[in-house]
Amino acid sequence: MASTWAFEAQGPGSIPGGGASYTSFMSLETVVVLAAGEGTRMKSTTPKVLHEISGRTLLGHVLHAVSGLKSKNLCIVVGAGREHVEAHVAQIAPHAITVFQEHRGGTGHATQLALAGTSSLGTSSQGTVLVLAGDTPMLTGASLEALLDVHHKGKFAASVMTAEHPDPTGYGRIIRSADGSFLRIVEERDASDEEKAIYEVNSGVYAFDGVKLAAAIGKLKNDNSQGELYLTDVLEILRNDGGSIAAVLIEDFIEILGVNDRAQLAESAALLRDLINDNLMKAGVTIVDPISTWVDSTATVESDVTLLPGTWIAGSTKVASGAIIGPRSTLLNCTVASGAQVIESHCTGAVIGANANVGPFTYLRPGTQLGASSKAGAFVEMKNAVVGDGSKVPHLSYVGDATIGEGSNIGAATVFVNYDGVEKHHTTVGDHVRIGSDSMLVAPITIGDGAYTAAGSVITEDVPPGAIGVARAKQRNVLGWVLRKRSGTQSADAASRHDDGKKG
């Protein structure tokens, strides 16, 4: 019988005896990601691996984990929702190839298809083949590196990543000999009561000698209750053929957690939230309420940022040191400069300058650029608008398709009227302009430097620099109108008392 070995990774990217050396990763020939599952328990028209948490799809998290391994080939096995998954892969991993598993045949069958697919492209069977599932979003590149380092240094036929799970129900158990050596994997349905009491479980992540895998995988049989080919059976075939097997125990079981339903999706999202927030706080970010604060794995938050309760930093958002975000704010694909403050606002695709102030209840849409020390205040909506340094839109305004210079002030309830029913038009407001409250700026127009508009004006023509634009009807007071037209009302009574007082 061939020898088998057990190792424990003492931390991400490490193995017993010292830090991992990854120079041997040049022999990593192929990474195979199994993403063909139907995901019926998700009860969704969206393929399981395309459900999102923390800024990436489940598959996206896995591909991110393997991205630093520098394999020669990346093969993704697709099945349910093939077209959607392939389109997503083309977007986030254009160098990858996909193979289609038309009928459910098990993990062994999926791996057979992957090997055949890469072989058809002239890929060598030499080197290491890494196989993992596409629904394990917590898996880290460091743990994969630890597995590969053990595998390469020991020249094993196969190495399997394992973890100790506090609730191992549903997982294949790792069976070891008296000396701790790896013996086999027993699936839950086949395990005895004694074996079910084992907490060490199979992660579904394997490193194989490519030549030996190619020879062994053809020997798989589907004589089991599911009628499928199990990749786990390859380990036993390799042992029987004289190969040595390593079991590499990683430190944190959450890395191997798969997602099969909405509850597990939420659980993984919360675990990833906690991990990200913990790392941010250790790096100098203040998070007042970590439970209600969500930062996507794709976002960047610098030290000395303060995140207040109910905040979501999403997508590719970057928040610079000294900024204060929240409470109850969302930033999606935004850039926030140092010292800026965003209060109770929703911002998408916006650039917020240094020491700028946003909110409360502000909606910044794509194309918005706020200069340094500028302001987009309460109940303001902006879209495709550039606001110069020191300019302010304090409240109750819509600014769309506009350029505002430096030091200008836009009065309350101003509307940049940009749409004529067919096309959008641009408004240009110069430096140190004062727009009166309740002005309508009907594009396309230009308000020159230092110009004013009178409150309540509907501006339809350019206002020259230094001029004031007045576009409103002259006020006319009709005396006695209320007593004549609204007699018997409280208003008429009040007016009558006023008249009586004057007579007295």
Residue ranges of model-derived segments:
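Conserved N-terminal catalytic core of the sugar/cofactor nucleotidyltransferase
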Residues: 22-30, 56-145, 149, 153, ...
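N-terminal nucleotide-binding beta1-loop-alpha1 segment
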Residues: 26-44
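Conserved alpha/beta core of the MobA/IspD/sugar-nucleotide pyrophosphorylase nucleotidyltransferase superfamily
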Residues: 27, 199-302
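Conserved core of the sugar-phosphate nucleotidyltransferase
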Residues: 83, 139-225, 232
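Acidic, glycine-rich loop-and-beta core segments that form the ion-binding/anion-interacting portion
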Residues: 299-368
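Glycine-rich hexapeptide-repeat left-handed beta-helix
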Residues: 335, 342-504
